[in-house]
Structures are given as structure tokens and as C-alpha cells.
Amino acid sequence: MIKIIPVNTKQLQRQFVEFQYELYKDCPQFVPPIKSDIYAMMNPKKHPFYDHSVADFFLALDGDKVVGRIAALINKPFNAYHQSTDAEFYLFDLIDNQEVANALLDRVAEWARERGMTKIVGPKGFGPLDGYGIQIEGHEHRQMMNMMNYNYPYYQTLVENYGFTKAVDFVSSYVDPQKIEVPEKVAKAASIAKKRGSLVIKTFKNKAELKQWIPQLRSAYNGSFVQNWEYYPLTKREIDFVVSNALILVIPEMLKMIVKDDKVVGFVLPFPDVSRAFQKNKGKLGPIEIIRLLAEIKKTNWIDFNGIGILPEAQGFGGNALIYEILIDSVHQNSRYQHGELTQVAETAVQMRKDLLNLGCVFYKNHRVYQKTIA
């Protein structure tokens, strides 16, 4: 019989975190997250999510053996913004067993009802960089660092058997950085925008120069995704958390901002793919692991774009075209990059998906966020 227990001791926290590493230890596509990041998600004193919202964590046991885990969340600002009563689940991992899946999801449903929620949505995490959904396509491809989730194909069957249906899909696109070209229509629109002079491209030589613009980047980040399915207004501490984590790996020379009247209205955030180093580090982040990450930054031939934003006020001035032109310029800067990915674009971002196809991108991974009414 499967037993579900709350994670309420340090020993159980450790079992919760370690279970994923054991489950995927022989999976070549899996990229282990940094363990301290997962522990931070479980710590109300460290993670800004808990400034406004709540979460609990559960383990599934078969006898004394851990066979699954799940986090149950309520994001109060998201619900307030969307006028919803959603509970969410995340950090969902388990063996291929329907009884285990049912027990974990039943516990989340019970937890949600106790708090007045009427629907469960997920996987959906603690912040915008956590990655959305259960992967339903592209399992043969390596996970893009920890900017998306990776799971075995059977997860889809288990949640759908439970009664979950699709809420929204997030696609990730493959692109050959050295072959991608700016379409004539895009180039013309970008040229007109630059000639008008109202939109200016800002470049950076190093992180010291970039840091001077971080306050403006924070503001632009919060305003660029208001039309996205997953959007809710981030608090200052959440924005600081997201931006500071993103800038650890970002390449200053390739990062571009669009500025209008000294205000950042668009940006492209490129990240060198250090997945191979993460795999070797196995969740650790000591001096040796940091050296390994720094070395991988200099030699990886993969680049990831997981932060392309444009404020609505700039879209009518050719901002969209300018964003794609500078994205392509960024990947052309360094011939070392032979592979690229644009990570997790929601299907509700219809125009952006069309733009990516026009640029020659190929959708090659799909993550599905599920929903189920529980009222």
C-alpha cells in the first residue's frame, strides 16, 4: 500500500531532494539541478515565493522506500491577477506506477480543497525560471540546463489517466545559429525602426557595465510578459531573485537591450549551455564544480535564449523586428556556437511562435501544463 507523508524534517527533505537524482541516474538526457536550489524552494526564509504564497511537500512511500514526490503550491498573486482559485503542483517525480501517481495527486487535491481551491494546475513552479509542464515530446534531446523540466515519457500517461487535461503547451525551438538569417521583411522593419531613432540598441562589454543597467532591466522584465499565460506581477524581491540568477550565466557581450528615451523596452538574454558541466557536477556546487562550469562556458557550442522580452509600448515602433534582428546578430557574433535553443514559448504567444517559424526555427520539444477541476 502506498503511503503519503508530509516532508517535515531535515531527513525527509533530503529524501525528497535525492529521489530525483536516484530516479534519473542512468538517463543521459537528464540535467541534474543544483541541490541547493531545490532546498531553497523548500525554505520560506530563502525563497521570495513565500513572501506572498504557500507550499507544502509530500513523499510517496512503498514500505520504507521512496517511490514518488510532489510539491503543492498556491500562488496568491497569480490567482488575484487572473481571478482564479488554482492550486499548483511541482517537483513531481515518481516511478512508473499509476497507484503512486493517484496517491500523490489525491493528496494535492485534498490539500487544495482544504484551502478553498477549485482547480489543480501544473507542473508550475516557484518562479518564472523554474520551467513549466510535463515533457510530452522531444525526450531524446538533452534537457536545456535547468530552465525546463525533464521527465520520462510515462509521466504523461499517468497524469492523463488521473483525469488531467491540457491547459497550455510550451514549445522549445532548435536553431542553427550560423545558418539563421534575418528575413527581408524583418530586416526592413528593423531598419525603419533604427532610422526613426526612437529605439536604440544598447550593447555591453562586460558585467561591470551591465550591472549599471540592472535596475532598468528588472523593470522591463516585469512589464514584458503581461500578455503571457503564466504572467503575474512579480514583487521586487522576486525580480531581483530572477535577474540575479539569470545574470550568473548570461554573456554580457551578447546581451542586447532596446532603449527608448533612456528606458529599457526590450531585451535578449543569451545563456551558454553548460548542461554537460551540470551533469558532471551531479547537483553539487563546490569549488571544483564552479571551475567545471566556468570551463564549460568557454567551450560549449550550444547557446540558449530564455529571456526575450519587448514592452507593449515598443511593439508598434518596430520593436519586435528589432528584437529578432539583434537575436540573430547575437548568435552570429561567435562562430563557436553551432546549436541553439529558444526555450519554452507558450502557445498563447501566437505572434512569437509565428515569428520563430519565419526565422527558420524548428519546434523540437513540447512541455504540457495540465489542469483538473476538483470542486
Go through the PLM ranges and name each one.
Residues G68, V168-D169, G266, K365:
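A structural microfeature
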Residues I74-P77, I308, K354-L357, Y364-H367, ...:
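Alpha-helical subdomain
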Residues F126-P128, Q178-I180, K207, D273-S275, ...:
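Short, solvent-exposed loop/turn segments at secondary-structure junctions
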Residues I2-K3:
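Extreme N-terminal starter segment of soluble prokaryotic enzymes
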Residues Q20-D62, I70-A80, F204, E209-G309:
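A conserved beta-strand-loop-helix scaffold within acyl/acetyltransferase catalytic domains
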Residues N79-G163, N281-L359:
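Acyl-donor binding region in acyl/amide transferases
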Residues N149-E230:
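Acyltransferase donor/substrate-recognition loop-hinge adjacent to the catalytic core
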